[in-house]
């Protein structure tokens, strides 16, 4: 069986295409992509079938076969993972356009349409669903074969979670944010939830990312004095709340992104690789700079966001003691 697994895996891997065409997401699925989809499904079918057989074997046999099963699973992921990465990059690119919008206007006419960047994101998700996910995701009847989540279902779930968190991250960085801007942002969040839920993955099943989206929407409408005691902040990463508070502070209270002259994309890449307590260190440095500016002028009054941000950040410090 072990030799057979090796031969079958090697033969199928050689058939996988890896060129640029496999990552295209702008047009219909190409014949090369469709062939890769078939290979993914075939390899996953082999993995599922053999896994069910191995479950009944002695543990010594399981130990021997496990590395080869892992190799089959990795091979099954290879034909589709670049496609999902390309789509994730596309959706992130759409979301980054939030920083090109004017959310600080006070007298803009409110309409029922989503922002232009959100409309582009919706179109992209709908196209991906129609041209790719319709071929990749299992039917409802086979959605959980042997209780195992399919590779493409897992990749779709991960992408949906990433889109929600990435959106909240960048929405929290928007500055300035007027009352009209809050309404526009809330509308965009509703459209995002609908697009992801209908075309990618049921948002209610995404757990923490979904709870964070649902918490951030009403959070932006709270008075600053209400935020410290609001249960909404329990469903949000502290960095999201802290970044949002910058928009409520004076211009001289610069965010780490502003202080370090980073683009939203650069700062986001940095955030991807940091823990919450590490992000707090960067935020604390800007609060210290702000305090120095205030004291150097002889002022004694700080913006209300200053003690609130220190309060939220101190909880991160205590958690890591």
Predicted segment positions?
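Extended alpha-helical "rod" scaffolds
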Residues: 1-321
């Amino acid at each position: 069986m072990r030799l057979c697994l090796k031969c079958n895996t090697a033969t199928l891997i050689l058939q996988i295409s890896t060129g640029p065409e496999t990552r295209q997401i702008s047009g219909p699925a190409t014949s090369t992509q469709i062939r890769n989809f078939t290979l993914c499904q075939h390899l996953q079918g082999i993995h599922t079938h053999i896994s069910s057989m191995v479950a009944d074997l002695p543990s010594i046999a399981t130990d021997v076969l496990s590395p080869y099963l892992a190799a089959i699973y990795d091979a099954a992921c290879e034909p589709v993972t670049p496609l999902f990465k390309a789509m994730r990059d596309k959706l992130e690119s759409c979301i980054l356009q939030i920083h090109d919008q004017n959310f600080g206007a006070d007298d803009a006419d409110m309409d029922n349409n989503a922002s232009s960047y959100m409309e582009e994101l919706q179109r992209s998700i709908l196209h991906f669903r129609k041209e790719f996910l319709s071929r990749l995701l299992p039917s409802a009847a086979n959605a959980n074969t042997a209780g195992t989540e399919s590779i493409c279902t897992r990749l779709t779930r991960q992408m949906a979670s990433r889109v929600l968190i990435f959106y909240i991250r960048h929405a929290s960085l928007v500055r300035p944010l007027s009352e009209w801007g809050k309404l526009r942002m809330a509308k965009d969040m509703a459209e995002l939830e609908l697009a992801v839920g209908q075309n990618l993955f049921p948002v209610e099943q995404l757990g923490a990312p979904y709870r964070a989206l649902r918490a951030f929407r009403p959070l932006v409408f709270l008075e600053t004095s209400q935020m410290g005691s609001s249960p909404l902040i329990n469903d949000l990463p502290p960095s999201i709340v802290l970044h949002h508070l910058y928009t409520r502070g004076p211009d001289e209270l610069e965010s780490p992104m502003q202080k370090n002259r980073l683009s939203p994309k650069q700062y986001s890449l940095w955030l991807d690789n940091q823990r919450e307590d590490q992000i707090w260190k960067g935020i604390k440095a800007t609060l210290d700079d702000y305090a120095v500016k205030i004291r150097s002028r002889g002022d004694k009054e700080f913006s209300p966001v200053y003690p609130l941000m220190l309060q939220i950040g101190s909880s991160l410090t205590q958690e890591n003691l």
